[in-house]
Each structure stands twice: as C-alpha cells, then as structure tokens.
Amino acid sequence: MNCDETWCRVRLNNKKQRKGYIWCLINKAAKIVIFFFDEGSRGRKVLTEFLGDANIKALKSDAYNAYYYLDDKECGIEHLCCLEHARAKSYQAWIQGKCEEAKFFLAKIEALYNNLERTYKEHGFTPELIKEGRNSAVTIEIISDIRQRVTQLLSDGIEKSEV
C-alpha cells in the first residue's frame, strides 16, 4: 500500500477558503485508489482512524511524521519510506544549498532507478526476475552505501536543513 497526503483549497460550511489536506491510499495489487478527507486535517488521527484495524502488512509513504506511529511494533504495519520522496528532498537540498551530501544520495538513487529499474522494464523482466534484481548484490550494495551514509550523517549531527 502507498499513502500520501497533499494540500488543496477547501471551503467548509460556506466559510472562507483555506488550506486543507486530502489523503490518498493506493493498493496497486488490488487496483484500488481511495481518497479520504477529514475537515482538511493532516493530523495522524485522520490516518489512524481511516486505517482502523485493517489488515495491512506494509505501507509506503514519505517521511511526514504522521506515519511514524507505523514504526511501533504494536501497530503491526511495516512502514516503508518512499525513495522517490528521499530523492526529491536530496534534489531540493542540492538546488537550494549546493549540499555536497545531496549529490551522493542523488547518484545512488539514480543508480537504482535509472540504471537498474530501467533495465528491468526495457528487457521486459517478469515480476520474479525484477524481485531477484532488487535483491541482487548490486542493489544491496547501493542500499548499504545509502544506509551507511545516513547513519554517519546522523551520528555526526548534520543539520536538518542540509539533507
């Protein structure tokens, strides 16, 4: 499952327009897209009440803090962070501040998306072959490099605004 929220202009009870949020939940396997809205709120309560006791094994999202409760083992949902959102944040850090660390992440994500994933599509890989590729030594090495750099940056106390 994928989940994201985005802002939109809302008018509630014929009052003045204001910024509000609409949520989207996608189940690609079942080919289902659900939009949900709760008075324009972006709070965690909107998500937790919508999901309720649904039997969801994993949910992929950006790093917005409303999703952090998914990391709680009691929740039973594995929280997967979206690499595309990480790429976008790295790109933004590079464009706005020429952050050298951002270049590292952009290069690694480029290797995953534009080299490996493009190859899978161009060669018409079956889902089984794509899974093998995504679990290959090359992919694992790239992901390990990213993880090591994130761990290093966190231990060094890099400023939030940089990457």
Language-model features: locations:
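Catalytic center-proximal scaffold of phosphoryl-transfer enzymes
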Residues: 1-163
